[in-house]
Amino acid sequence: MSRVADTIARRKGEAAGALIGYLPAGFPDLRTSVDAAVALAENGVDVIELGLPYSDPVMDGAVIQAATQRALANGFRLRDGFAAVREITSRVDAPVLVMTYWNPVMQYGVDRFADDFATAGGAGLITPDLIPDEGADWLAASERTGLDRVFLAAPSSTEARRRQTAANSRGFVYAVSTMGITGVRTDVDAAARTLVGRLREAGALSACVGLGISSAAQVAEVLDYADGAIVGSALVTALAKGGVAAAGRIAAELARGAVRG
């Protein structure tokens, strides 16, 4: 079983759901991004999702785009992502998933990326613009290295796509709660509940919901039917406005919503 799946199973055993927290590597600088990720884990975040800055982030909303563009402007390089993963995993036990668009992985070399990422202590990849039937190289590399592979499913996904995604994901399936780009929303789209049910019918062992979650109440709402809640923009905003301490405080607030019952 994967480290991420182990974490989700442990939280289920504690009558709780998994809280997954996203931050971009290198924002506002590499050192601070590492310290912030550690602070999330120390304040109740179960799995760290570390975003690799990319020049064409088609799924990211304004908050995350601004953060990743600042990281790139400051000179972020892919090797910095591996260094960040290495230090985070040396300081906390929470597994670290990297969210990356596929082009940087291809440019680096899929096998080389998998090897270097696994050596750094990474748990797996979330690949928003890669679908399983176009990812044969990644499927092979992840099998060889034992890395998790988290594919996305949306409310618009066909039954065939949901089955393919469920069959090829390891760790969990990322259920996109609403159509569109990332960002804080007042209400988490009700389509997420239906999507998670359909993913379970398709064979998904675990499904975690992301896009739009920003409060403990929304975390609790999502964990009523999903295995994990993924929070990004709210944490990035806290880091941008108040630094590491603020990100930790928001993480602690969100974690209160992860306890069921």
Curated annotation (Swiss-Prot):
Record key words, sorted: Amino-acid biosynthesis, Aromatic amino acid biosynthesis, Lyase, Tryptophan biosynthesis
GO MF entry, a single one: tryptophan synthase activity
Pathway: Amino-acid biosynthesis; L-tryptophan biosynthesis; L-tryptophan from chorismate: step 5/5
Class of this enzyme: lyase
Coiled-coil ranges (or none): none
Positions of the catalytic residues: 49 (proton acceptor), 60 (proton acceptor)
Gene3D superfamilies linked to this entry: Aldolase class I
E.C. code: 4.2.1.20
GO terms for cellular component: cytosol
Known partners and oligomeric status: Tetramer of two alpha and two beta chains.
NCBIfam families with a match to the protein in the record: trpA (TIGR00262)
The family this protein is said to belong to: Belongs to the TrpA family.
Function: The alpha subunit is responsible for the aldol cleavage of indoleglycerol phosphate to indole and glyceraldehyde 3-phosphate.
UniProt protein name: Tryptophan synthase alpha chain
Gene for this chain: trpA
